Amino acid sequence: KDGYPVIKTTGCKLICVGISDNKSCDRFCKKQGGSHGYCHAFGCWCEGLSGSTPTYPIPGKTCKK
């Protein structure tokens, strides 16, 4: 599946700023089991995640920074 994987401790998506963060988003997504990732709308968007990977927003859970 595709989406914004969440940081497990906060329930938030990983924030990024523009194409300069594409490499860090790609690394983050691959660590989450995705095929690749990039910065999109100020968050790391991942493609190819497993169906069990939680993505933002998580129903009933808010982002706590």
Swiss-Prot record:
Q: Which UniProt keywords apply?
A: Disulfide bond, Ion channel impairing toxin, Neurotoxin, Secreted, Toxin, Voltage-gated sodium channel impairing toxin
InterPro entries (alphabetical): LCN-type_CS_alpha_beta_dom (IPR044062), Scorpion_toxin-like (IPR003614), Scorpion_toxin-like_sf (IPR036574), Scorpion_toxinL (IPR018218), Scorpion_toxinL/defensin (IPR002061)
Domain of life, source organism: Eukaryota
Q: What are its GO cellular component terms? A: extracellular region
PROSITE patterns to which the protein is assigned, alphabetical: LCN_CSAB
UniProt note on tissues of expression: Expressed by the venom gland.
Intracellular or extracellular location(s): Secreted
Q: Say if the entry is tagged with keyword Glycoprotein.
A: no
Q: Name one GO biological process term.
A: defense response
Q: Where is the LCN-type CS-alpha/beta domain?
A: 1-64
Q: What are this entry's molecular-function GO terms?
A: sodium channel inhibitor activity; toxin activity
Q: List the disulfide bonds.
A: 12-63, 16-39, 25-44, 29-46
Which Gene3D superfamilies does this chain map to? Knottin, scorpion toxin-like (3.30.30.10)
Q: Which family does it belong to?
A: Belongs to the long (4 C-C) scorpion toxin superfamily. Sodium channel inhibitor family.
Misc. comment: Negative results: has no effect on Nav1.8/SCN10A sodium channel from the grasshopper mouse, a species pain-resistant to C.sculpturatus venom.
What is this protein's function per UniProt? Probable sodium channel inhibitor.
Q: Record's domain comment?
A: Has the structural arrangement of an alpha-helix connected to antiparallel beta-sheets by disulfide bonds (CS-alpha/beta).
Name listed for the protein in its UniProt record: Toxin NaTx-22
